[in-house]
Amino acid sequence: MYNKCDIIIEIFDIRINKIKNTDFKFCINRWKERFKLELRKIKSIKQIRNIYKLYQNSFPKEEKKPFGLILIGVLRGNFEVFSIEKKKNDEKNRNSYEFKGLTIALKHKDLVLLDYLAITEEARSYGYGSKTLSFLKEYYKNYRFFLEIENAEDENAENYEERQSRKKFYLKNGFSPFPFNVDLFGIEMEILGYNCSCEFSEYLELYKNQFGGIMKKKISENIFLVEK
């Protein structure tokens, strides 16, 4: 007679044997990799260089802010930049890390806009994007945390499938659409929030707070509400 424990072991053994050994090892290694991930505030020139290079290579020209202004924003407290890093298995140097990606967030009052998230090409099969979002959702749990994506409902867009995939990724990670879109310097963007929402006026104020003087006027003239 089999008891319940024996049956569970048999089922587990059968399912494991259906997986190729190499595939199983890859799944286990990928699972282990995710738990070594850390988000570290920039403290070195090396981190800044890594972030700058990935930033330049990951986003379209029309969507990028001048990197120097982002660094100034960090000093002013308007921006928060993290280097996504994995601790190396190096017994000789236990404080050695590998660069895996970046996050750049814009802060104002209780609002946090995840302005940029990028993972290095070689690290994209390990679930680092989802793990990073988990870290950020916990880190900003006392804020209204949201992000922008290109309008995923524009079927005429050249990168329509990519937009759809990006939206599905964020929805899978617990984000949901705001009741409005925005025209951001000529690009229609959807706003996705994590258990939150905000008024368009608050969203606009967040951007105006980035820069002073002439830029405030430029922002007012180039960011518009798009009703759904």
Feature map (PLM): residue ranges:
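A short, internal acetyl-CoA/4′-phosphopantetheine-binding micro-motif in the GNAT/acyltransferase core
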Residues: L117-R124, N151-E153
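Conserved GNAT acetyl-CoA-binding A-motif
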Residues: Y140-E162
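C-terminal "cap" of GNAT-fold acetyltransferases
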Residues: R163, D183-K228
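Short amphipathic alpha-helix that is part of the acyltransferase structural core
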Residues: C27-F67, E202-L206, E221-I223
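Conserved beta-strand in the GNAT
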Residues: S83, S96-L106, V112-A118
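A conserved beta-turn-beta hairpin within the catalytic core of GNAT-like acetyltransferases
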Residues: K107-L114, R124, Y143, E188
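Active-site rim helix/loop that mediates acceptor-substrate recognition in acyltransferases
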Residues: Q56-E91
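Conserved acetyl-CoA-binding loop-helix of GNAT-fold acetyltransferases
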Residues: I119, S125-Y139
